[in-house]
Amino acid sequence: MVKKSKVGSTGRFGARYGRKAKRTVKDIEDKMHAKHVCPKCDRPGVKRTHAGIWKCRKCGAVFTGGAYIPTTPMGKVAKRNIKRITGGE
C-alpha cells in the first residue's frame, strides 16, 4: 500500500516550487479558509472578498483586516489600546 501524501491545496503545483514554499502557501491558505468570527454579530461566517477586505455572510458587515486573516496582531494591539484609552467600553 502506498503512503498517501497530504498536499492539500498545494497539489495544484505538482513537482514545482519546492517543499518549503508549498508548505508556506498551504499554511496561509488553511488560515485564510478557516471559519472566522464576525466582529459585529459574533457569528462564524466571514469570507474574504478581496485582499484585506472581509464580509460577513450573516449580517452583511464589510470590514478591513489582514490580507489572509481578518485580524492582524497589530490590529489587536491597536484595539486593546483604544479600549484602554476610552475606558473599556
Curated annotation (Swiss-Prot):
Q: What is this protein called?
A: Large ribosomal subunit protein eL43
What family does this belong to? Answer: Belongs to the eukaryotic ribosomal protein eL43 family.
Q: Which domain of life is it from?
A: Archaea
Task: Name any GO cellular component annotation.
Answer: ribonucleoprotein complex
Location of the region described as Disordered in the Swiss-Prot/TrEMBL record: 1-28
The protein's matches in InterPro entries, at most eight in alphabetical order, are given as: Ribosomal_eL37/eL43 (IPR011331), Ribosomal_eL43 (IPR002674), Ribosomal_protein_eL43 (IPR050522), Ribosomal_zn-bd (IPR011332)
Keyword Metal-binding in the entry? The reply is: yes
